[in-house]
Amino acid sequence: MKRAIILVLDSFGIGAAGDADKFGDVGSDTMGHIAEQCDKGLADNGNRKGSLTLPNLSKLGLAMAGKESTGKFSAGLDANAEIIGAYGHAAELSSGKDTPSGHWEIAGVPVLFDWGYFTDKENSFPKELTDRILERANLPGYLGNCHASGTQVLDDLGEEHMKTGMPIFYTSADSVFQIACHEETFGLDNLLTLCQIAREELEDYNIGRVIARPFIGPGKGQFERTGNRRDLSVEPPAATILQKLVDEKGGQVHSIGKISDIYAGCGITKKTKATGIPALFDATKEAIEQAGDNTIVFTNFVDFDSAYGHRRDVAGYAAALEYFDGRLPEIMDMLQEDDILILTADHGCDPTWPGTDHTREHIPVLVYGHKVPAGSLGRRDTFADIGQTLAEYFETSDMEYGKSFL
């Protein structure tokens, strides 16, 4: 029986990519800089202290993959761990350093076209676009229209939004149109309807995602984003390994978290919503228990990116990694004879880096299974090597990009 479990540690890069200069990211290193700060005692909080401790990920080769990526071991990680899995690092072919590009490339379909972006920091959106959205949604106006941090924009505009009923429109360096609205005063259903309108109106702009950002709270300093985020993505430009498994093998793909949204539902046969790393772990375990032959269980752990990377919270990121590492054996112990477990990322988001955006980095490729030989996979030229490996594993037709490392 063949089953693959893919765990994406969203934003967990392991060193600047060779083309990082094109993105202003030379020297970025999400893992390395977190480990360095921890080792210096600069990432202590109520949940953790001291050096970054990831014994289970190190056994799977994480520390070695980081060394192969950057030329040096990350501070404090166990460089002498007994390696029980295959490990490597992968560079990105895709033109961007965003979530859809990274995930699609992991599934064998790199994004070789250029996304559309809203590059102006203020007055970011064309008036004709916002006019059409407001007219269709029957709204009197909007707030924002700028590049913004998702939490800061709530403090800046949340109270005015609650008073006026006008949605908050904002963007970032990614190919996104984000809409923040209060779940209680504006309504979650109204927000999702508004986002669908925006998705349709953005078709000519080649924008990757419209993101619904619902929040709650009584006022400034007390607003919190909820777990009802929704990503409305465009469809991948070609069949991913997910789609091929379903179409060619009658297989199953169980999405946990926001995976289904990222692939616009393409190739997804079942989806489970879960919020927060503990709940995502629990949902993943339940999916593995239920998984039959020719099944992919695919989980995105978004909190590494959204709660810690973008917010430049080194201590929070480190604590989340250590929690993840502590629970990893629960999944490893569930693997059957022919199963494979793949741990990877979709881009970097170095919490020590200037600004709040993603960073162009190599991603880890850690593979574990009873029949997977331990050792180095070396440098992979594209994330699509993962998709091609899955194509060989499940015996589907080949992907156009990538080389299998089986």
Curated annotation (Swiss-Prot):
Coiled coil: none annotated. Binds 2 manganese ions. GO terms for cellular component: cytosol. InterPro entries: Alkaline_phosphatase_core_sf, DeoB, Metalloenzyme, Phosphopentomutase_DeoB_cap_sf. It is an enzyme of class 5 (isomerase). Its EC number is 5.4.2.7. CDD domains: PPM. Its main location: cytoplasm. The keyword Cytoplasm applies. It catalyses: 2-deoxy-alpha-D-ribose 1-phosphate = 2-deoxy-D-ribose 5-phosphate; alpha-D-ribose 1-phosphate = D-ribose 5-phosphate. Isomerase that catalyzes the conversion of deoxy-ribose 1-phosphate (dRib-1-P) and ribose 1-phosphate (Rib-1-P) to deoxy-ribose 5-phosphate (dRib-5-P) and ribose 5-phosphate (Rib-5-P), respectively. This is Phosphopentomutase. It comes from Aliivibrio fischeri (strain MJ11). The lineage of its organism: Bacteria, Pseudomonadati, Pseudomonadota, Gammaproteobacteria, Vibrionales.
